[in-house]
């Protein structure tokens, strides 16, 4: 059974779906399944030239926007690369980016297409100051959801809250399947350790949407209250200089370590005590599940998929976004009470192990894929056609 996992970012990109898919591929490795990964190399720019036409809206209405123009050129480039590189048939294509799914439907019109929408690109741009709320760019990006609904055989997303977000932009929201990302519990796992001073950590791209400015302000309050801690910020991005300057201004720079980009955060994560990320928006928040599998106590904001992962006071703590006082109060609780911190981490690990392990997600995906693959339409795998009837 030939499956194509179609990504936008290369698989080596850290975080979210890009870090999940290579491990997903390992779990599908058998005589029954053959999975290929595909993405657009960063070097491919301005190669595609053909027109772009959508069925449910006219993108040219928004064509004066440079951001929209960039999206359309990316579509052209991805289509050009797909037509150049993909020659064999597939039994099913699973796309993980809106533009990718639309390209795959155009290039492979008769192949079943499953589309997962992992995040709201329009709100990321709004929160990061790239576009205005209510802008033509936001309207263009939200129009893509109905186009995806029209072109996909199954539309999926990663949290119930994000499905609710999609309601105004699609015709049949009740048909959207919710399946969280899965995480390799052999890669993200606890390591016994003892820290004399509580170790806080965040892992994210350094952009305004992640709320790290609020975290630094909360840490300044903790310091004023006399609490010792070390804050580890793993990641890089356009806000790094501003965040380092803010840390100096608040007097917490000496208590904060900016690591920059790291390819394998799981090598650091198990040795810390508390994971905190005060995001202003998250469709799911994959890094919370990863931290939970490493037995860290979770502190997050009551937004999007974070509040589906964390039950406040049970397996973590939730605070409102943009509230450094309540964030400091929550951190104070887990810093002051190691037993409470341990209990939150334990229940968080149990939930992540049960609901977000990659084994669970693989089983759900296999059931979903098989719905679209009648036996008489399965393309034989090389050298194993006679073994197709085997059950894993």
Language-model features: locations:
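Conserved acidic donor-binding segment of nucleotide-sugar-dependent glycosyltransferases
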Residues: 312-313, 317-324, 333-338
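Carbohydrate-associated surface elements
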Residues: 161, 182
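Membrane-proximal helix-turn-helix segments that form the acceptor-binding/catalytic region
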Residues: 135-155
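N-terminal strand-loop element at the rim of the active site
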Residues: 6-14, 20-72
């Amino acid at each position: 059974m030939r499956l194509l996992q179609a990504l936008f970012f290369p698989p080596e990109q850290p975080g979210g779906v890009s870090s999940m898919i290579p491990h997903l591929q390992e779990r599908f490795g058998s005589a029954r399944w053959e999975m290929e990964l595909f993405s657009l190399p960063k070097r491919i720019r301005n190669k595609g030239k053909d027109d772009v036409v959508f069925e449910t809206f006219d993108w040219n209405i928004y064509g004066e926007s440079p951001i929209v123009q960039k999206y359309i050129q990316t579509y052209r480039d991805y289509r050009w690369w797909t037509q150049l590189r993909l020659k064999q048939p597939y039994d099913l294509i699973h796309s993980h980016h809106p533009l990718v799914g639309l390209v795959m439907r155009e290039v492979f019109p008769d192949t079943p297409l499953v589309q997962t929408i992992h995040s709201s690109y329009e709100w990321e741009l709004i929160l990061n100051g790239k576009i205005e709320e209510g802008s033509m760019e936001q309207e263009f990006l939200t129009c893509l959801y109905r186009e995806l609904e029209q072109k996909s055989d199954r539309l999926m997303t990663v949290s119930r809250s994000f499905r609710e977000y999609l309601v105004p932009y699609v015709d049949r929201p009740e048909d959207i399947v919710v399946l969280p990302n899965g995480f390799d519990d052999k890669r993200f796992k606890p390591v016994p350790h003892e820290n004399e001073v509580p170790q806080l950590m965040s892992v994210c791209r350094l952009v305004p949407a992640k709320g790290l400015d609020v975290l630094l302000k909360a840490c300044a309050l903790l310091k004023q209250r006399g609490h010792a801690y070390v804050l580890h910020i793993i990641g890089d991005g356009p806000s790094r200089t501003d965040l380092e300057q803010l840390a100096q201004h608040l007097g917490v720079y000496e208590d904060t370590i900016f690591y920059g980009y790291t390819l394998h955060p799981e090598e650091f994560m198990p040795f810390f005590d508390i994971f905190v990320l005060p995001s202003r928006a998250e469709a799911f928040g994959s890094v919370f599940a990863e931290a939970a599998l490493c037995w860290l106590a979770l502190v997050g904001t009551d937004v999007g998929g974070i509040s589906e992962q964390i039950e406040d006071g049970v397996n973590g703590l939730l605070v409102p976004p943009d509230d450094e006082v309540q964030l400091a109060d929550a951190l104070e609780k887990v810093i002051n009470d190691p037993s409470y911190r341990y209990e939150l981490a334990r229940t968080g690990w149990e939930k992540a192990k049960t609901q977000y392990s990659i084994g669970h997600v693989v089983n759900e995906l296999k059931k979903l894929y098989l719905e679209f693959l009648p036996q008489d339409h399965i393309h034989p795998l090389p050298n194993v056609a006679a073994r197709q009837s085997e059950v894993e």
